[in-house]
Amino acid sequence: MSKVIETKQQVVTEIADKLRA
């Protein structure tokens, strides 16, 4: 479960970074 949350957080961070750029 912890890994799933970590992966989701990573994806969210990636999307946020793309939106900023």
From Swiss-Prot:
It comes from the Bacteria. GO terms for cellular component: ribonucleoprotein complex; ribosome. Keywords: Ribonucleoprotein, Ribosomal protein, RNA-binding, rRNA-binding. One of its GO terms (molecular function) is rRNA binding. Forms part of the ribosomal stalk, playing a central role in the interaction of the ribosome with GTP-bound translation factors. Under acid-stress, this protein is expressed at a higher level in wild-type B.cereus than in the acid-sensitive mutant strain NB1. Belongs to the universal ribosomal protein uL10 family. This is Large ribosomal subunit protein uL10. It comes from Bacillus cereus. The gene is rplJ.
